[in-house]
Amino acid sequence: MSKYRREFVLCPSFIRKKDELPDLVWNTIKFNEPSPNLPDHQGVYAFSINVEHGSLPSNSYILYVGKAGDTTSNNTIKKRYRDYIREARVQSRPKIHRMLNLWAGHLTYHYAEVPNGVSTGDIEEQLTTIFIPPYNTNDFLVEVRDLLKGASIL
C-alpha cells in the first residue's frame, strides 16, 4: 500500500492564485488513448486520476503539471503526449516513469493551448503553485519551492 501513498498539499492562499491565470480552455482524454487528435501547438497539461462512477461524487487528483513549448521552444502538446507514451516504456525520468506505470489505466491527460508569445513556463509555475502536484519537483515559484523544502515536502 505504501507505494500508492502520495502527499497532497492544498493551501488556500495558493489556490487563490487561480484568479491570476489567463483564460485557458481545457480538453481531457484518457492517457494511453491510441492516436489521440492532439494539437500541434504550445500549451500546458496535467495528469490526474479521476475515479468516475455514478455512485461517486466528482473528484480529481492532480499528479503532475507540465508545459509544451514556450517562447523559445517549438515543442507541442502532441509531442509531449508522445514523449509520455515512450516514458511509460523506457525509464529516462524515474519519478515520471513510476507515476505513469503505477497509475496506468487510471490517468487522465488534460491540456490547454496557450497563444504564441505567451510563456507556458509562467503558466506552468502558476498551476504547480495552485495544485502542488506530488510528482512535480522543480517547476514551482522560488518562494513556494523554499516553503515546500522547509516543510520537507520536496
PLM feature segments, named:
Residues 1-63, 67-154:
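Boundary/linker segments flanking structured domains
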